[in-house]
């Protein structure tokens, strides 16, 4: 019984570690996907503001 509980707790720990690793990887993938879009949006926003400022 003791070994079974130890094994289950070890399994639970490795599972949480794997889930955490997956979450970090997904966050990194999201950042990689969204970074160009964010840069594009920020650049177009900045260009729009400067264009309006120069025109006015």
From Swiss-Prot:
It holds the Pfam family DUF5485. InterPro entries: DUF5485. This is Uncharacterized 6.4 kDa protein in HE65-PK2 intergenic region. It comes from the Viruses. It comes from Autographa californica nuclear polyhedrosis virus.
